[in-house]
């Protein structure tokens, strides 16, 4: 992964195409870069309100990444705003702002808003990026996320991940427990429920286009259905009735196929389904439990976990089921592997036992089983941490985290995100308990 953001703080401050080819996972932490997101200029009161809200979202996006430190507007010296003037760079350097964002919002006759921004390097006194967006009022948050994505990409060299969605399972705290599929922005905003809570639902997954989701619903104890829901129209249809399915399918990069695990005759195996013909093809053989399949970004490989050797471990096979190779060799049980969109790492859940009982861990390992450096790295641990999934740029991992009940408080489950390096762990706020997160690709 490119590492240009860590070079910004060097003595010869520079935001250019210079970049390291890979990030050092063991030593990936750096001080966040100070950035000033200035008040957006506006041509009327409606545009002013919109600009104010957008500045807050942009600043929050950059702060949540852990790579930027937005400077409080209370310390700003220069009073000019907008994109029509060249900043007084000395005034921004005086408050230690390495980067400056200026912008403006104008309301158009169509009712839409034209949003423009410029990213400045205050030390080199040069423009680094700029763009104009035309957006309807109801999509102002997406416009703010897109601006933050542009800033993130210009400084880090990696694509941003702010204009994305999270689908997850929401669970009420009161009895009886009600589980519903919910959808929200990556930062927890715009939460809405997609199912009514009348049946048990599990493991929502995005289709490759991110405008559809699939999830498992237990219509009855014996009948398990996989549903497809169109997020644009709200229409829902049954993909299939799969007795013994344990998780919703994961989709191939081309969107034509999906893999799932199904229990039959005492064993659980990996199956691939052709979404056009609905034809199933069994990929694993023998006895045991084979679950949680996930495609590689190029669709040529599948990672999954299996207890074929007594303890659940991680395996990789070709997408046709051939050339099976074990890739995990540490102590403990492995589960829920998820292949990074970059193709370099696989995230997983690992359960270890000690004197204090079980400990759940989220870790990453190199995806190449022949790599001598295929050592795993645990990035977070807890009473219950599970279901890792990746940001579209492979920089951040989102997961579910749980706490046990105590005399002072009931148990709870929430969604957290953490940097690939194991730093910057933070909670994604949800209205109720939450589990089984799935991260969309960047929205169109």
From Swiss-Prot:
Key words, A-Z: Cell cycle, Cell division, Periplasm, Signal
Location of this chain's protein in the cell: Periplasm
Alphabetical list of Pfam families matching this protein: PD40 (PF07676), TolB_N (PF04052)
GO aspect biological process, one term: cell division
Superkingdom as given in the UniProt entry: Bacteria
Signal peptide: 1-19
One cellular component term from this protein's GO annotations in UniProt: periplasmic space
Main location: periplasm
Keyword Cell cycle: yes
Disulphides: none
Oligomer status and interactors: The Tol-Pal system is composed of five core proteins: the inner membrane proteins TolA, TolQ and TolR, the periplasmic protein TolB and the outer membrane protein Pal. They form a network linking the inner and outer membranes and the peptidoglycan layer.
Task performed by this protein: Part of the Tol-Pal system, which plays a role in outer membrane invagination during cell division and is important for maintaining outer membrane integrity.
Family: Belongs to the TolB family.
Protein name as annotated: Tol-Pal system protein TolB
Gene giving rise to this polypeptide: tolB
């Amino acid at each position: 992964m490119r590492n240009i953001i860590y070079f910004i703080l060097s003595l010869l401050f520079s935001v250019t195409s210079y970049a390291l080819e890979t990030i050092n996972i063991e030593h990936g932490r750096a001080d966040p870069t100070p950035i000033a997101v200035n008040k957006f200029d506006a041509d009327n009161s409606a545009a002013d309100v919109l600009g104010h809200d957008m500045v807050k979202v942009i600043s929050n996006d950059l702060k949540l990444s852990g790579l930027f430190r937005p400077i409080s507007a209370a310390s700003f010296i220069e009073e000019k705003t907008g994109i029509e003037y060249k900043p007084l760079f000395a005034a921004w350097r005086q408050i230690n702002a390495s980067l400056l964002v200026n912008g403006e919002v104008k309301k158009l006759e169509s009712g839409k808003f034209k949003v423009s921004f410029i990213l400045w390097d205050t030390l080199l006194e040069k423009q680094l990026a700029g763009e104009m967006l035309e957006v309807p009022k109801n999509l102002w948050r997406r416009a703010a996320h897109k601006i933050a994505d542009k800033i993130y990409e210009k400084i880090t060299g990696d694509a941003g991940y702010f204009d994305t969605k999270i689908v997850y399972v929401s669970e009420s705290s009161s009895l009886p427990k009600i589980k519903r599929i919910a959808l929200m922005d990556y930062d927890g905003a715009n939460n809405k429920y997609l199912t009514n809570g009348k049946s048990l639902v599990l493991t929502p997954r995005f289709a490759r286009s991110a405008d559809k989701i699939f999830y498992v619903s237990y219509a009855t104890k014996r009948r398990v259905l996989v549903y497809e829901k169109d997020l644009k129209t709200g229409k829902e249809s049954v993909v299939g009735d799969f007795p013994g399915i344990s998780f919703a399918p994961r989709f191939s990069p081309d969107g034509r196929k999906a893999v799932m695990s199904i229990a039959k005759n005492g064993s659980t195996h990996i199956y691939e389904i052709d979404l056009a013909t609905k034809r199933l093809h069994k990929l694993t053989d023998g006895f045991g439990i084979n679950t949680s399949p996930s495609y590689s970004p190029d669709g040529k490989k599948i990672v999954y976990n299996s207890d074929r050797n007594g303890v659940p471990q991680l395996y990789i096979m070709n997408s046709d089921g051939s050339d099976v190779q074990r890739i995990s060799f540490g102590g403990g049980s492995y589960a829920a592997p998820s292949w990074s969109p970059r193709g370099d790492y696989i995230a997983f859940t690992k359960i270890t036992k000690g004197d204090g009982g079980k400990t759940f861990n989220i870790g990453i390992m190199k995806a190449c089983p022949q790599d001598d450096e295929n050592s795993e790295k645990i990035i977070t641990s807890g009473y219950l941490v599970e279901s890792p999934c990746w940001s579209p740029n492979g920089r951040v991992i989102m997961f579910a985290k749980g706490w046990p009940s105590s005399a002072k408080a009931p148990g709870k489950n929430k969604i957290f995100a953490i940097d690939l390096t194991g730093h910057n762990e933070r909670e994604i706020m949800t209205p109720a308990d939450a589990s089984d997160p799935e991260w969309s690709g960047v929205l169109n």
